[in-house]
């Protein structure tokens, strides 16, 4: 009688690449959808946080967004994407609810053929794209944790696993 050990492989998040994001935006006709997608990809905020944003949460001068009552009822400050233009403020608050925004995202991802290159892509993949780009560009994981609003660093560490090139680069620099 032996003991069987089960090994669980954790699925890595599905992240949108910069090319995928550009492809998505090119096929997005509604400005409020473009703004929502830009905020997800450029600031790493969740779909619910995008839908809850108010004009006074965005500080154009300091290029910051105050995310109020994020997951776990926590407030945090995140960067305003460089591509965010003053006229985009007219779209805040976003004119649709979470479900409608996710549906629009899926529809545009299909039309833009993004679903063909990244199967099962969804709005949250924008946030994963933000996080994986941050890690690829050398952002310390504890800074990323703060921006994403994670209470546990192990939640953020998954983005390190998505970037094996970073580990290889660190190895090459050491040896």
What are these regions (language model features)?
Residues 1-23, 68, 92:
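Flexible interdomain linker/hinge and immediately adjacent N-terminus
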Residues 14-47:
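Basic, Lys/Arg- and aromatic-enriched nucleic-acid-binding interface segment
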Residues 40-62, 109:
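Short, charged phosphate-coordinating catalytic segments
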Residues 49-50, 121-122, 131, 138-152, ...:
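Active-site-proximal segment of tyrosine recombinases
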Residues 52-85:
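Conserved tyrosine-mediated DNA breakage-rejoining catalytic core shared by Y-recombinases
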Residues 69-72, 148, 153-173:
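Catalytic-site neighborhood detector that most strongly recognizes the C-terminal catalytic loop/helix
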Residues 81-118, 124, 130:
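Active-site/catalytic core of tyrosine-dependent DNA strand-transfer enzymes
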């Amino acid at each position: 009688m032996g003991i069987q050990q089960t090994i669980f492989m954790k699925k890595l998040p599905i992240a949108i690449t910069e090319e995928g994001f550009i492809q998505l935006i090119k096929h997005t006709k509604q400005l409020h959808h473009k703004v929502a997608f830009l905020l997800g990809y450029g600031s790493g905020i969740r779909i619910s946080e995008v839908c809850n944003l108010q004009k006074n949460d965005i500080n154009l001068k300091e290029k910051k967004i105050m995310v109020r009552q994020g997951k776990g009822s926590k407030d945090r400050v995140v960067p305003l994407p460089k591509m965010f233009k003053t006229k985009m403020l007219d779209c805040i608050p976003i004119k649709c609810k979470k479900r409608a925004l996710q549906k629009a995202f899926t529809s545009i991802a299909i039309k833009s053929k993004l679903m063909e290159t990244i199967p099962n892509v969804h709005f949250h993949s924008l946030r994963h794209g933000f996080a994986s780009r941050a890690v690829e560009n050398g952002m310390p994981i504890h800074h990323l944790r703060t921006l994403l609003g994670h209470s546990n660093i192990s939640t953020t560490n998954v983005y390190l696993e998505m970037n094996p090139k970073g580990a290889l680069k660190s190895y090459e620099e050491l040896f």
